[in-house]
Curated annotation (Swiss-Prot):
<keyword id="KW-0687">Ribonucleoprotein</keyword>
<dbReference type="InterPro" id="IPR001209">
    <property type="entry name" value="Ribosomal_uS14"/>
</dbReference>
<dbReference type="GO" id="GO:0005829">
    <property type="term" value="C:cytosol"/>
</dbReference>
<feature type="binding site">
    <location>
        <position position="39"/>
    </location>
    <ligand>
        <name>Zn(2+)</name>
    </ligand>
</feature>
<keyword id="KW-0479">Metal-binding</keyword>
<dbReference type="InterPro" id="IPR018271">
    <property type="entry name" value="Ribosomal_uS14_CS"/>
</dbReference>
<feature type="binding site">
    <location>
        <position position="21"/>
    </location>
    <ligand>
        <name>Zn(2+)</name>
    </ligand>
</feature>
<comment type="subunit">
    <text>Component of the small ribosomal subunit (SSU). Mature yeast ribosomes consist of a small (40S) and a large (60S) subunit. The 40S small subunit contains 1 molecule of ribosomal RNA (18S rRNA) and 33 different proteins (encoded by 57 genes). The large 60S subunit contains 3 rRNA molecules (25S, 5.8S and 5S rRNA) and 46 different proteins (encoded by 81 genes).</text>
</comment>
<feature type="binding site">
    <location>
        <position position="42"/>
    </location>
    <ligand>
        <name>Zn(2+)</name>
    </ligand>
</feature>
<dbReference type="GO" id="GO:0022627">
    <property type="term" value="C:cytosolic small ribosomal subunit"/>
</dbReference>
<dbReference type="Pfam" id="PF00253">
    <property type="entry name" value="Ribosomal_S14"/>
</dbReference>
<feature type="binding site">
    <location>
        <position position="24"/>
    </location>
    <ligand>
        <name>Zn(2+)</name>
    </ligand>
</feature>
<dbReference type="InterPro" id="IPR043140">
    <property type="entry name" value="Ribosomal_uS14_sf"/>
</dbReference>
<dbReference type="GO" id="GO:0003735">
    <property type="term" value="F:structural constituent of ribosome"/>
</dbReference>
<comment type="function">
    <text>Component of the ribosome, a large ribonucleoprotein complex responsible for the synthesis of proteins in the cell. The small ribosomal subunit (SSU) binds messenger RNAs (mRNAs) and translates the encoded message by selecting cognate aminoacyl-transfer RNA (tRNA) molecules. The large subunit (LSU) contains the ribosomal catalytic site termed the peptidyl transferase center (PTC), which catalyzes the formation of peptide bonds, thereby polymerizing the amino acids delivered by tRNAs into a polypeptide chain.</text>
</comment>
<dbReference type="GO" id="GO:0002181">
    <property type="term" value="P:cytoplasmic translation"/>
</dbReference>
<keyword id="KW-0862">Zinc</keyword>
């Protein structure tokens, strides 16, 4: 059993490891509200394109 077969072979069905950003595939800082599933860094870049406006 080589390292390639063992790495990430554990099933991730729940928890932070099971979800990733749909833009950059990062697992950290996910915004899951409204079904976005985008990390906060990508959200700041794409917020205007998605339709979020900053009122301030």
């Amino acid at each position: 059993m080589a390292h390639e077969n063992v790495w990430f072979s554990h099933p991730r069905r729940y928890g932070k490891g099971s979800r990733q950003c749909r833009v950059c595939s990062s697992h950290t800082g996910l915004i899951r509200k409204y079904g976005l599933n985008i990390c906060r860094q990508c959200f700041r870049e794409k917020a205007n394109d998605i339709g979020f406006n900053k009122f301030r």
